[in-house]
């Protein structure tokens, strides 16, 4: 199984600079990126303002999940190249990929993916110049 946590990058800046309708657009684009990248009946859900989770049950491995992440990032890349928006829509992603046992709760696995997502978001912030 895998759990993917995604958090839209720079939503506050988009809302504050370009208005909430553009922020809503960025959220919708993120939802579309996740939904259109699903290939095996994964569950995609918005869990908060700019936070999403994707859960895939079954036989997933790191290569399959990495392909899924590449598809999401490819969706964002194509959107950003064609949208003519003054901002980029991107998301930070964290993943748990492995097995679940009777001692592990779904919340614990989501927390693992969430922590990785925030680690990735902080790395992006440190490398960004905006």
Predicted feature locations:
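Conserved long alpha-helical elements within nucleotide-processing catalytic cores of c-di-GMP signaling
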Residues: 1-2, 9-39, 45-49, 53-54, ...
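Sensory input modules used in signal transduction
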Residues: 5, 56, 93-97
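Residue-level recognition of strand-loop junctions within catalytic nucleotide-signaling folds
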Residues: 16, 55-60, 77, 98-99
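A short linear boundary/processing microfeature
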Residues: 20-21, 36, 58, 78, ...
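Catalytic-core segments of nucleotide cyclases and related cyclic-nucleotide turnover enzymes
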Residues: 66-73, 77, 81-84, 97-129
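PAS and PAS-like sensory/regulatory domains
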Residues: 87-92
